[in-house]
A protein has these predicted regions:
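Active-site environment of non-heme Fe oxygenases that use a 2-His-1-carboxylate facial triad
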Residues: 1-61, 76-77, 124-261
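N-terminal, charged low-complexity regulatory/assembly segments
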Residues: 47-53, 72-91, 100
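Short, solvent-exposed beta-alpha or beta-beta edge segments that form flexible loop/patches at the rim
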Residues: 62-68
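A structural signal for short, well-ordered beta-strand segments and their strand-loop junctions
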Residues: 81-85, 114-116, 160-162, 173
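Short catalytic/ligand-binding loop motif for oxyanion handling, primarily in non-cytosolic enzymes
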Residues: 90-93, 169-171
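Signature of the catalytic double-stranded beta-helix
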Residues: 93-115, 237-255
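A gly/proline- and charged-residue-enriched helix-loop-helix capping module
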Residues: 102-137
Length: 262
């Protein structure tokens, strides 16, 4: 892998599929000025500014960072990276991290509009008490393994997640599972029920006024399985689909090959 000045790249301690990308202090220092040119309101209301800060980030790496992260995402053997400042300081606050996530996202493509937040990104708090209509903001419940974009018409190719702040908590881990490491992938992806169209809806908080239909499993050009699934939103049409979803959920959650990250 080509060395990029100001950036450290190494494999995650628990999985060679995940690459850790750490921005050295000098890179972070040089990002402060171009990032401060736009406040979050400007980024939300003027889409071209998002590409401006993305270019500022890439320019600091001689345009090598964009090539690296795109190669990771497009390689099925990896497909995941964790990026952030090597050292956290007062300057790398929540606004800086939103801008960094924005820059990274726009080195990859154009994010889908988030109907829940009404912006190009969603931001929310996980609190001690929560009365919302999904597991998303509930502090004491595990969210089962899932993919994003199951209930919308837009194609969801990739996902950027950022933890902006953490206070007075324990836990807060993220669980991930690569399909090619999943013990039950071959059996379930080839099950004819998993290739039927399922109805996918969403609760009111998502602000989506339609439902979509698609199978849980499909296959890429090389015949390798792909999955689009979340446990909360499918509406099985019959016993066969309902039992398949239960079997799928159990098989995902019992996997011994999940990777846990903070």
């Amino acid at each position: 892998m080509e060395k990029i000045e100001g950036i450290e790249v190494h494999n995650h301690k628990d999985s060679s599929r995940i690459l850790n990308i750490q921005l050295d202090d000098e890179i972070v220092k040089k990002l402060i000025f171009p990032f401060n040119k736009f406040d979050l309101t400007a980024l939300e209301l003027k889409p071209f500014t998002r590409f401006t800060i993305a270019k500022s980030l890439d320019d600091l790496t001689n345009n090598k960072l964009s090539k690296l992260i795109n190669s990771i995402l497009r390689d099925r053997s990896t497909g995941c990276f964790i990026i952030g400042p090597k050292n956290i300081s007062l300057k790398t606050n929540d606004k800086f991290l939103v801008k960094l996530a924005t820059a990274v996202a726009h080195l990859i493509g154009v994010p889908n509009h988030d109907s829940m937040a009404g912006k190009y990104y969603a931001r929310f708090h996980v609190k001690h008490e929560d009365a919302s209509d999904s597991y998303l903001r509930k502090a004491y419940r595990n969210m089962d393994l899932h993919t994003d974009g199951t209930y919308v018409k837009e194609v969801t190719d990739w996902l950027v997640m950022t933890k902006l702040e953490e206070q007075n908590v324990q836990g807060g881990e993220t669980a991930m599972l690569h399909l090619d490491d999943w013990e039950h992938c071959d059996d379930l992806s080839k099950d004819p029920v998993g290739q039927q169209d399922f109805v996918w809806g969403s609760p009111k908080s998502k602000n989506i006024d339609y439902k979509v239909e698609h199978p849980v499993f499909s296959f890429d050009k090389e015949g390798r399985p792909k999955i689009s699934y979340i446990d909360q939103f499918p509406e099985p049409k019959n016993m066969e689909q309902g039992n398949f979803l239960q079997k799928l959920s159990d098989a995902l959650e019992e996997s011994k090959n999940k990777i846990i990250t903070k």
